[in-house]
A protein has these predicted regions:
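Glycine-rich phosphate/adenosyl-contacting loop at the front of the ribokinase-like
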Residues: 1-33, 38-52
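Beta-strand->loop->alpha-helix junctions that form or flank phosphate-binding loops
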Residues: 4-7, 31-36, 54-64, 133-135, ...
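Conserved phosphate-binding/catalytic loop of the ribokinase/pfkB sugar-kinase fold
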Residues: 33, 55, 59, 69-104, ...
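Short beta->alpha connector loops
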Residues: 37, 87, 110-114, 134-138
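Short gly/ser/thr-rich secondary-structure transition/capping motifs
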Residues: 51, 84-91, 130-137
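Conserved phosphate/ATP/ADP-binding segment of small-molecule kinases
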Residues: 122-185
Length: 185
C-alpha cells in the first residue's frame, strides 16, 4: 500500500482529551507511563507546554505508546495502537490520583481495563463525574459500564456495545434505544 504523506504528532486519546480539557481552562492531570525514548521526550515537552500536571506520569522501561493512523481517500481512518509503557498502568497507579467531588474523571481504553475500572471506582467514591471514550473498543465489564456517567462513542463503538448493527438507515429513535440498552444489560 503506497502512501503520499506522513506526519509525526504527539497524541493518543488520553493525551488529546487532557489537552482539550486544559485548553478549556480546566486544571488537568494526566496518568500515564512514558518510555525513555525520543517519543517520550517529545511527549513530556508537549504535555508541559499545555500546562498539564505531570505528577502522575511515570517513566517506563518499555517504549512510549504510539498509534499509527492511516486515512484513506474517503477520509476513513484505521488505527493501530501499541500501548507500550501505558500497558503497565494498574489499580495502584490510579489510587495515587487525587480526585475531589465535582471533578470530571476522563478515560479511554488505551490502558488496561482493570486500571480504568479502579480509577472510575475511586472517582465515583470521591463524588466525581466519570466520562469514558471506550476506544479501542473491546468488551466492557458490567462494573465499568455502571461506573460510567458519560459514554462518548462513535457508530462502530455503539454497534459493538449494544451488540447490533447500526447503519445510515438506523433511525435516531433506534439509536437512542440501543444506547439505553447498554446500561441495562
Amino acid at each position: 500500500i503506497a502512501g503520499h504523506c506522513v506526519e509525526y504528532l504527539p497524541g493518543g486519546k488520553g493525551l488529546n482529551q487532557a489537552v482539550a480539557c486544559a485548553k478549556m481552562g480546566a486544571k488537568t492531570a494526566l496518568l500515564g507511563r512514558i518510555g525513555n525514548d525520543t517519543f517520550g521526550t517529545e511527549l513530556l515537552g508537549f504535555i508541559k507546554k499545555h500546562d498539564i500536571e505531570t505528577t502522575y506520569l511515570q517513566s517506563s522501561s518499555r517504549p512510549s505508546g504510539i498509534a499509527v493512523v492511516t486515512v484513506d481517500a474517503q477520509g476513513q481512518n484505521s488505527i493501530i495502537v501499541v500501548p507500550g509503557g501505558n500497558n503497565d498502568i494498574n489499580a495502584e497507579d490510579t489510587a495515587a490520583v487525587k480526585i475531589s467531588a465535582g471533578d470530571i474523571a476522563v478515560s479511554q481504553l488505551e490502558i488496561p481495563l482493570e486500571a480504568v475500572t479502579a480509577f472510575f471506582r475511586k472517582a465515583k467514591n470521591c463524588g466525581a463525574v466519570t466520562l469514558l471514550n471506550p476506544s479501542p473498543i473491546r468488551n466492557l465489564p458490567d462494573e465499568l459500564i455502571n461506573l460510567t456517567d458519560i459514554l462518548i462513542v462513535n457508530e462502530t463503538e455503539l454497534s459493538f456495545l449494544c451488540r447490533r448493527p447500526l447503519t445510515d438507515n438506523t433511525s435516531p429513535q433506534e439509536i437512542a434505544e440501543a444506547a439505553q440498552n447498554i446500561k441495562s444489560r
